[in-house]
Amino acid sequence: MTSSYKIPKERRLQVYNTVSGSSVIVLLFWYLLLLPNGIFGKTVMINGVAVNTTNSRQLNFALFDAVEYGRMEDVRQLTELGASIKARNRFGNTALLIAARKGHLKIVQLLLDVGSDLQHQNLAGNTALFQATKARRRKVVKYLLASKAAVNVANRQQLTPLIAAAYNGDRKTVQLLLSHGADPTLTDQTGKTALVYASGKGFSKIVGLLLDTGIETSIRYGNELTILMWAAGHSDDVPSQAALKTVKLILSKGANPDLVDKRGQTALMIAAEMGHLSIVEHLLGIGAMDDVRDIEGRTALDLAESENHADVAKLLR
């Protein structure tokens, strides 16, 4: 015998009403979500990506992406839709700093026009001016300076835009920064100035520009080294002719070749130890002392021989 159970009418109505009510809620949710201007905000397409205009995170990410890739009209639209020009990425960069680094001049102009902070520093302490200078974006540098960007702000390593430009060998930007009040005497956290970096890298034209500001050649920097010593002890990646030209320029400005550093070494001794034959030859030619002994009692000849620079040692004998 089979038995059947019929759900009471009252119970059937209760189940139907529950299911129907849930369905209505779900349908209403999707209806509101898909409304172009519903309570969930307007959805716009930015470079093929749907962006909800009430979602500040989506707007700001879209702004960073548009700035990074130089999409001017997208940047304009996003700022009009409410993307924050104050928003920062994980490095502390605002849209302006990104645009400056990438060299997107028109976007830089737009962001400044809508109120971006010209002096904002990211987590490394870099300003938009520093970002543009380091990346060799001269047109952006020029515009930022014309917009009254602070020229001597240093980052967390105490690097200024002028130091960055000198390190890069960017003579025109060095000249531009100096004309807007850049201070050539400022040092980084290692005690080096723009002039020290330019001297050590053989950028003679930049050295000339910086010396023309009135800096004395006898000033000592880290480890009591003068700029002549930095030039004489240049690294091997610096072309020898560029280094020699820099040494000659510094000497022509009155540098004393016989000053010693904290180790008791002269420019001649430093050049001898590094094996820089042409510089040793030039220093000897102008009468640099070759019998000076450092704090360990070594002469230029001793230093050359200790590093197996036979050609330099032969010249010094």
What spans do the regions from the language model cover?
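Conserved ankyrin/ankyrin-like repeat signature
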Residues: 74, 106-107, 139-140, 172-173, ...
